Amino acid sequence: MKGKGRNRAVKSLEIYVRKLAQANGIKPEMAAHIFHLIYEETPNGGISDDDLESLTGYKQSDIRRILRLLGDKRIIVSRKGRHPRKEATRYFWRIDSDTINVSLLTLKKKVLEKLVVKEAHDSGNSYYTCPRCGSKYSFDEAFTLDFTCPRCGEVLEEADSREGLERLRRTIDALREEIARDESRIYRS
């Protein structure tokens, strides 16, 4: 990852880390902070959980929980090392560009899969919107509501979803191309 691509990838990863943390009952800002410290120390061989604790003031149990989560998702990797003054083994955490690229590719494929499902669903269904408040309902929902908005009482109108579907299809095509480029870069022989 170089230049603008690196910055975009780091921002995407930070968003992903925050969502992962939140889904696992961890404070998103804490996980993002740990991620950024690891990212900054990766060129220096990584950072230990002891160093993360002294730099952040976070409890070691919280730090290790975040490290385990990021490690399980292959965002970070560890290596064993010796503590300079103790006989204890330390683990140094760093971002490995190979595993992170594969993780990002996997994430993109999951997003693509969801978009394809949405496109299939949206192309096979009609929607109704409220011209006053903008609420959107499927045909079945609108039928149940007698084509009247439950929020404001306005008559629902059939939505023209062609433009939205076209935009969704362009997004799907662009993501497929990006995935193909990433796969050729990651798996080239």
Curated annotation (Swiss-Prot):
Domain remark in the UniProt entry: The winged helix domain is involved in binding to DNA in the preinitiation complex.
Domain HTH TFE/IIEalpha-type: 9-101
Family indicated by similarity: Belongs to the TFE family.
Gene3D superfamilies: Winged helix-like DNA-binding domain superfamily/Winged helix DNA-binding domain
Name of encoding gene: tfe
The species this protein was found in: Aeropyrum pernix (strain ATCC 700893 / DSM 11879 / JCM 9820 / NBRC 100138 / K1)
One GO molecular-function entry: DNA binding
SUPFAM superfamilies tied to this protein: Winged helix' DNA-binding domain (SSF46785), Zinc beta-ribbon (SSF57783)
Coiled-coil regions, chain positions: none
Keyword Cell membrane: no
Any single biological process term in GO: regulation of DNA-templated transcription
InterPro entries listed in its UniProt record: TF_E_archaea, TFE, TFIIE/TFIIEa_HTH, TFIIE_asu, TFIIEa/SarR/Rpc3_HTH_dom, WH-like_DNA-bd_sf, WH_DNA-bd_sf, Znf_TFIIB
Protein purpose: Transcription factor that plays a role in the activation of archaeal genes transcribed by RNA polymerase. Facilitates transcription initiation by enhancing TATA-box recognition by TATA-box-binding protein (Tbp), and transcription factor B (Tfb) and RNA polymerase recruitment. Not absolutely required for transcription in vitro, but particularly important in cases where Tbp or Tfb function is not optimal. It dynamically alters the nucleic acid-binding properties of RNA polymerases by stabilizing the initiation complex and destabilizing elongation complexes.
Protein name, as recorded: Transcription factor E
Keywords: DNA-binding, Transcription, Transcription regulation
Subunit record text: Monomer. Interaction with RNA polymerase subunits RpoF and RpoE is necessary for Tfe stimulatory transcription activity. Able to interact with Tbp and RNA polymerase in the absence of DNA promoter. Interacts both with the preinitiation and elongation complexes.
Disulphide-bonded residues: none
